[in-house]
Amino acid sequence: MPLRRFSPGLKAQFAFGMVFLFVQPDASAADISAQQIGGVIIPQAFSQALQDGMSVPLYIHLAGSQGRQDDQRIGSAFIWLDDGQLRIRKIQLEESEDNASVSEQTRQQLMTLANAPFNEALTIPLTDNAQLDLSLRQLLLQLVVKREALGTVLRSRSEDIGQSSVNTLSSNLSYNFGVYNNQLRNGGSNTSSYLSLNNVTALREHHVVLDGSLYGIGSGQQDSELYKAMYERDFAGHRFAGGMLDTWNLQSLGPMTAISAGKIYGLSWGNQASSTIFDSSQSATPVIAFLPAAGEVHLTRDGRLLSVQNFTMGNHEVDTRGLPYGIYDVEVEVIVNGRVISKRTQRVNKLFSRGRGVGAPLAWQIWGGSFHMDRWSENGKKTRPAKESWLAGASTSGSLSTFSWAATGYGYDNQAVGETRLTLPLGVAINVNLQNMLASDSSWSNIASISATLPGGFSSLWVNQEKTRIGNQLRRSDADNRAIGGTLNLNSLWSKLGTFSISYNDDRRYNSHYYTADYYQSVYSGTFGSLGLRAGIQRYNNGDSSANTGKYIALDLSLPLGNWFSAGMTHQNGYTMANLSARKQFDEGTIRTVGANLSRAISGDTGDDKTLSGGAYAQFDARYASGTLNVNSAADGYINTNLTANGSVGWQGKNIAASGRTDGNAGVIFDTGLENDGQISAKINGRIFPLNGKRNYLPLSPYGRYEVELQNSKNSLDSYDIVSGRKSHLTLYPGNVAVIEPEVKQMVTVSGRIRAEDGTLLANARINNHIGRTRTDENGEFVMDVDKKYPTIDFRYSGNKTCEVALELNQARGAVWVGDVVCSGLSSWAAVTQTGEENES
């Protein structure tokens, strides 16, 4: 039958008719026009409503539970009366992270119900472990399940960030500027400079990236280079890109070590997308807890409580993001109403992996286009000219438990290349990495590394080896090297000992050897600071040349308030030098760090080197740029000076602002309208950022969700009332620049004494300003908050007459005493007749 709306009139009749519902029919009920369903007398009005059809809530109820306090709503059902038979037309399930879940079999039974009739007990059996029970008295439907019919509420391992919050054209420009000057020993000098620019312009999720640099600015050898000009759309788990980029910026799921330097003009498509966030911090093996009612789950390891979490009734996966990494057992304890219901041991499997996380789908990417290969040379022996070629390939990656892998197959210049990368943690102690390459010109490469933490937790060891043989086509060099190293933490054996590290590198192709040994020990750590001892030795052999050995020993002193000093000696190039270093850090201001170092030869033959050398540096963080200025006089007599600065500019419509930060290529412009050096703070995902003056730009990482809250700054005397725009929720893609324009009132707490023009005090008078009112005391004194944009106080008397006080608050901050002020327009307070509300505005 066609579905009809339950009209307001019928709702009223139904509400009235419910009063006459009875469990047992009696004689009087039989006389009226009524119907009995499931032992319940249905009045005529309610029967008509049921024939029209109505929606009732659907709750899940655990069999054997007393009462309905732990029932959870999981959807709704549409019921109707058909020729005296009560039926379910359909069921609509409502998904919720907090709700219990039903098994897939039970879910399918619910979704396929169509015109299913209730039996005389108002029940519809679904499976051996689940049935539907209808209560006409409460007008609700219960899904009564045994534990076997419950599903498990698993935690999502991935999530799409959704649509962009910025629906207009916007842009982010990042800049990096550097100037270098070398003053030679003979008086000559040379200067070089560069300016790198990265611009991302976006419309919602679509963006265009331009990346390039200018070199030798202001010199006769000026040059420029464009590294990337590309359109990209990364949305809902898929990424498309097209344009030009150099091979240094090539993005691939798998290794691509056989690609030579050059530029690629092509397209790329795949599901390796930043718009989908994968959570790899959960245990690979889910930790599951069953709760018969709402309660708590306690996780304990070796008697130590790790986590307490609250859940509703059902099977739930416990959140393991905050647990330590490793493979270990935890005791899962379920507590309901203060009583321990169950206790069992489960395994946590959390290991670092390079994949997208457990449960992530297979990642893939296809790409291709035209490849301009740059001229290539190997030590002047082999030379290949620049060349144009085709390029096509595919990449894929995945994981199985803690094992992750990646593979790439591609071709160019009539060569086929295949590469793989494998990562396998062997328990908590050992991690193995393998990377291989094989090409059709008989080129091959193998890179293997193993890292291990030895038993006891006081030492670690790593081994790397690379061997590469190149055929007659690929533009790469042979390689044959190995390295081994380790760290021994002697603190675990005796607290007064330190940490010893050693490494050895052997490049057999160039017949060079290099080893280092370092020792660090904390001598003192307390209220007055910390003192540490460093010592080490390094030795380098290159081919047939004699060995070069260097030694050092130093004491590092760190003091409170950001002070650091170091004193020591080094021996290298046949002579010994004494070294002094100092550094000071600042929490506020433009200059954040200043430092200096000084070295003097104290023994041995310095040859042509100077006996005294040193340098100084400063790190700055200004409104529009941040960077470093460094001046250094080396032992060879050269004086090197360099300046680096970077920052960002954000633009959207009429709004443009700059920042000395380069946190990302998206951001937010705050148009606060604050005068002079006014300051408030922006709290973004828990981090606090200062906002100064009328307009600020804060660059942020793209592909992120941000919760932004404006608040008063703890470092400012000013008080602001943020009337609107206090909180915002943003989703930003590359190039997205959001604009937040809050209504901000700068508040000043003003106190003083108000007089009429003849000097008489306005005692017990109601005075007003732009945002509020107050009453003076018997001495005419008052205290009230005033908006600095409207620095006036007025007093209304004798009907429509008004006097006004103009306050001078330009320099006022926080609270101010203005002393005696005159209300212009009121000749005398004595002449005012106080009658009720006469003096109220």
Curated annotation (Swiss-Prot):
Signal peptide start-end: 1-29
Role of this protein: Part of the ecpRABCDE operon, which encodes the E.coli common pilus (ECP). ECP is found in both commensal and pathogenic strains and plays a dual role in early-stage biofilm development and host cell recognition.
Domain of life of the organism encoding this protein: Bacteria
Stated family: Belongs to the EcpC/MatD family.
Pfam families the record matches: CooC_C (PF15976), TcfC (PF16967)
Organism of this sequence: Escherichia coli O127:H6 (strain E2348/69 / EPEC)
Organism placement in taxonomy: Bacteria, Pseudomonadati, Pseudomonadota, Gammaproteobacteria, Enterobacterales
Induction per the UniProt record: Negatively regulated by H-NS. Positively regulated by IHF and EcpR.
Coiled coil: none
Keywords tagged on the record: Fimbrium biogenesis, Signal, Transport
Record SUPFAM superfamilies: Carboxypeptidase regulatory domain-like
Protein's name in the database: Probable outer membrane usher protein EcpC
